[in-house]
Design a protein with these regions (language model features):
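Bacterial N-terminal signal peptides
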Residues: 11-20
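C-terminal capping alpha-helices of c-type cytochrome domains
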Residues: 105-112, 118-139
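Sequence context surrounding c-type heme c attachment/ligation sites in exported
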Residues: 54-61, 96-100, 121, 138-139
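Sec/Tat signal peptide C-region and signal peptidase I cleavage site
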Residues: 21-27
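Electrostatic cytochrome c docking/interface patches
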Residues: 29-59
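Electron-transfer interface patches adjacent to heme c in soluble/periplasmic c-type cytochromes
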Residues: 86-100, 116-126
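N-terminal secretory signal peptides that target proteins for export/translocation
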Residues: 1-6
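Sequence/structural segment immediately N-terminal to covalent heme-attachment motifs in c-type
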Residues: 49-73, 79, 108
């Protein structure tokens, strides 16, 4: 009987340990994007112009501002109710991403960040939105 209890305790402790490590690893990688290599060097095919930036600004106001805020700091009215941190588009970390990486993130989404393929179905509109996001650098 004692041998059974020891085995049961050992198995229980092992399961608890595995669960604890998986929770820690999941928490550490929650904000990590797995971006395919082709997007890391992908260039924006839409020429930057007053029109593309203005169109991007309109799309931002409609689809992004509620979470990312007026200035793109990640402090929009919906941000406080989310259990994740919204990206700060003015940050060096965000601005260091390639246009292709940003395009992938907004197109595919992850977790609380929705995919914008259906909400902004035209690729060129999403590329124009990236031009607008670039105007937020260092604000």
């Amino acid at each position: 009987m004692k041998s059974f209890q020891i085995r049961l305790m050992t198995i229980s402790m092992g399961m608890l340990l595995v669960f604890s490590f998986s929770t820690i690893i999941q928490a550490q990688t929650a904000g990590v994007w797995n971006i395919p290599a082709k997007y890391k060097t992908m260039k924006n095919p839409v020429a930057k112009s007053k029109e593309s930036v203005a169109n991007g600004k309109d799309l931002y106001a409609k689809h992004c501002k509620s979470c990312h805020g007026t200035a793109g700091l990640g402090d929009g009215p919906k941000a406080a109710s989310l259990d994740v941190t919204c990206s700060d588009f003015s940050s060096k970390k965000f601005q260091a991403l390639s246009d292709g990486e940003i395009f992938f993130q907004m197109s595919e989404g992850k977790g609380k960040m929705p995919s914008f393929k259906k909400l902004i179905p035209e690729d060129n509109d999403r590329w124009g939105l990236i031009h607008y996001l670039r105007t937020m650098a260092g604000k």
